[in-house]
Amino acid sequence: MMEVFMNFLDQLDLIIQNKHMLEHTFYVKWSKGELTKEQLQAYAKDYYLHIKAFPKYLSAIHSRCDDLEARKLLLDNLMDEENGYPNHIDLWKQFVFALGVTPEELEAHEPSEAAKAKVATFMRWCTGDSLAAGVAALYSYESQIPRIAREKIRGLTEYFGFSNPEDYAYFTEHEEADVRHAREEKALIEMLLKDDADKVLEASQEVTQSLYGFLDSFLDPGTCCSCHQSY
């Protein structure tokens, strides 16, 4: 049984690796300093919807979970998101403001259809009938973040004039915290998995696709990854 489960986790990780955000053209351009300030601003404002929604994803799973140990792990992640000042939403705002976006601009921003679709995908799986699939949706995202955060910091400091660590503290925080979150989420999938392995893999496929679709929205149609890549 353990070997079968490990093969299942390998399948999950393969789905994520085959559509890793760090390989997306938008993040490749970020790492090379090839994005414009306007592209970074548009991205930062549009990503805000997901940042605000992330604690709700966790709450949706936590509130319906009967396993005490699983709830503790979910609550630990949720507390990381919302506790203290600055919390993760505050840290994201610091990044956005460092790009020259005003608080009024950020709050008045109308999220794109791609941003709404991404959040809707996460929420659908996190509120669905499979708790393991909901956690898999989170794992498919958070397991990628440490590498991405490290590369974002490098790009921001080398090419985009970021010298104050507070301006990219959101990424510094997630470079470390999401290593633990991903490890805990992998354990949670094992704890919560029933006969819903297919849903777990489906959740990962849909989430990784929605993440790519969101990043595509900041590129010219001819360079978007979803237009000419298949996995």
UniProtKB/Swiss-Prot annotation:
Cellular component GO terms, alphabetical: extracellular region; host cell cytoplasm
Site positions for Side-chain cleavage: Y27
GO biological-process terms attached to the record: small molecule metabolic process; sulfur compound metabolic process; symbiont-mediated suppression of host tumor necrosis factor-mediated signaling pathway
Cellular localization per UniProt: Secreted; Host cytoplasm
Ligand binding (Fe(2+) 2): E81, E142, D178, H181
Effect in UniProt of substituting H88A: Apoptotic activity is decreased by more than 60%, but the mutant still binds to death receptors
Domain of life: Bacteria
Cofactor binding description: Binds 2 divalent metal cations per subunit. Can use a diiron cofactor for catalysis. However, activity is much higher in vitro in the presence of both iron and manganese, which implicates a heterodinuclear iron/manganese cofactor.
EC number(s) on file: 1.3.3.-
GO molecular function: metal ion binding; oxidoreductase activity; toxin activity
Binding site for Fe(2+) 1: E81, H88, H174
Stretch forming the signal peptide: none
Disulphides: none
Effect of K152A: Retains 5% of PABA synthase activity in the presence of iron and manganese
SUPFAM superfamilies linked: Heme oxygenase-like (SSF48613)
Cofactors: Fe(2+); Mn(2+)
Key words of the record: Host cytoplasm, Iron, Metal-binding, Oxidoreductase, Secreted, Toxin, Virulence
Subunit description: Homodimer. During infection, interacts with death domains of mammalian tumor necrosis factor (TNF) family receptors Fas, DR4, DR5 and to some extent TNFR1, but not with the respective downstream adapters.
The family this protein is said to belong to: Belongs to the CADD family.
Note: Can complement the PABA-auxotrophic E.coli mutant lacking pabA, pabB and pabC genes.
Name assigned to this protein: 4-aminobenzoate synthase
Origin organism lineage: Bacteria, Pseudomonadati, Chlamydiota, Chlamydiia, Chlamydiales
